């Protein structure tokens, strides 16, 4: 079974993850988001429970 032989695919997987972790990820994290989070105060609304007819 060729899937059990890690020789061909393990090096490719390791190279891909190292490339992503060391090169691509820092470049992507340097961008500023287009919609930064705001300091809004969350408002909670008062809800009244619904009365069940059989209780």
UniProtKB/Swiss-Prot annotation:
GO cellular component labels: mitochondrial membrane; proton-transporting ATP synthase complex
Function, as annotated: Subunit 8, of the mitochondrial membrane ATP synthase complex (F(1)F(0) ATP synthase or Complex V) that produces ATP from ADP in the presence of a proton gradient across the membrane which is generated by electron transport complexes of the respiratory chain. ATP synthase complex consist of a soluble F(1) head domain - the catalytic core - and a membrane F(1) domain - the membrane proton channel. These two domains are linked by a central stalk rotating inside the F(1) region and a stationary peripheral stalk.
Subcellular location: Mitochondrion membrane
Topology within the bilayer: Single-pass membrane protein
Protein name: ATP synthase F(0) complex subunit 8
GO biological process: proton motive force-driven ATP synthesis
Residues that span the membrane, as ranges: 7-24
Keywords (A to Z) from UniProt: ATP synthesis, CF(0), Hydrogen ion transport, Ion transport, Membrane, Mitochondrion, Transmembrane, Transmembrane helix, Transport
Keyword Ion transport among UniProt keywords: yes
Keyword Membrane (UniProt): yes
Family, as annotated: Belongs to the ATPase protein 8 family.
One Pfam family linked to the record: ATP-synt_8
Coiled coil residues, start to end: none
Subunit (UniProt): Component of the ATP synthase complex composed at least of ATP5F1A/subunit alpha, ATP5F1B/subunit beta, ATP5MC1/subunit c (homooctomer), MT-ATP6/subunit a, MT-ATP8/subunit 8, ATP5ME/subunit e, ATP5MF/subunit f, ATP5MG/subunit g, ATP5MK/subunit k, ATP5MJ/subunit j, ATP5F1C/subunit gamma, ATP5F1D/subunit delta, ATP5F1E/subunit epsilon, ATP5PF/subunit F6, ATP5PB/subunit b, ATP5PD/subunit d, ATP5PO/subunit OSCP.
InterPro entries: ATP8_metazoa (IPR001421), ATPase_protein_8 (IPR050635)
Gene name linked to the record: MT-ATP8
GO molecular function: proton transmembrane transporter activity
